[in-house]
């Protein structure tokens, strides 16, 4: 059976997600038609410990490419763009008290928001998934010289068992 997740330089790369490579944002299409948004392992490693987050509230419509959230760490602050346009239907309230869940579990407890997509088929065409995503993320890791840390990677991989 093929692995659902790869690891490279300690960075966990789930193959079943869709990715915005340059912004290091992931998207998961859920069975109910919503899309979960989060920051990749690579993105959290580059940002450092997340200390503050702002997330658009439920009911807010987010245009393609506009921020669904913004993050702040000791060394970085920036947007989390929504490559999938739609209405925010839920946000991860846990992050307001514990924003570093993004660092600890970027693909699980550290998810940021859920969107009801306006045009999912169109928007997915601009993202990468599967082996193509793994290859492009490995290239990004090399280019930006990212190391996510082996010990933490083992914890994150358990999420996919």
Swiss-Prot record:
User: Subunit info?
Assistant: The glycine cleavage system is composed of four proteins: P, T, L and H.
User: By its UniProt entry, which Pfam families does this protein fall under?
Assistant: GCV_H
Query: What binding details are noted for the cofactor?
Result: Binds 1 lipoyl cofactor covalently.
> What's the protein called, per UniProt?
Glycine cleavage system H protein 2
The record's similarity note reads: Belongs to the GcvH family.
Going by the UniProt record, its keywords in alphabetical order are: Lipoyl
Q: Does the keyword Nuclease apply?
A: no
Q: Does the keyword Translocase apply?
A: no
Q: Name one GO cellular component term.
A: glycine cleavage complex
Q: Which cofactor does it need?
A: (R)-lipoate
Q: Which residues form the Lipoyl-binding domain?
A: 34-116
Its domain of life reads Bacteria
Checking Gene3D superfamilies in the record gives:
2.40.50.100
Modification sites for N6-lipoyllysine:
75
Protein task? The glycine cleavage system catalyzes the degradation of glycine. The H protein shuttles the methylamine group of glycine from the P protein to the T protein.
Query: What GO biological process terms does the UniProt entry carry, in alphabetical order?
Result: glycine decarboxylation via glycine cleavage system
């Amino acid at each position: 059976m093929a692995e659902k997740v790869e690891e490279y330089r300690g960075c966990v790369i789930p193959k079943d997600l869709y990715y915005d490579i340059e912004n290091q944002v992931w998207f998961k299409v859920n069975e109910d038609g919503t899309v979960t948004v989060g920051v990749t392992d690579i993105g959290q490693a580059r940002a450092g410990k997340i200390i503050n987050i702002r997330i658009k509230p439920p009911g807010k419509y987010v245009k393609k490419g506009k921020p669904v959230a913004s993050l702040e760490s000791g060394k970085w602050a920036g947007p989390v763009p929504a490559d999938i346009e739609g209405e925010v239907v839920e946000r991860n309230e846990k992050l307001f008290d514990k924003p570093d869940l993004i660092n600890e579990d970027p693909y699980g407890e550290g998810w940021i928001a859920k969107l009801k997509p306006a045009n999912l088929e169109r928007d997915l065409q601009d993202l990468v998934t599967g082996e193509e995503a793994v290859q492009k993320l490995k290239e990004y890791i090399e280019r930006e010289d990212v190391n996510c840390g082996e010990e933490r990677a083992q914890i994150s991989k358990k999420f996919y068992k």
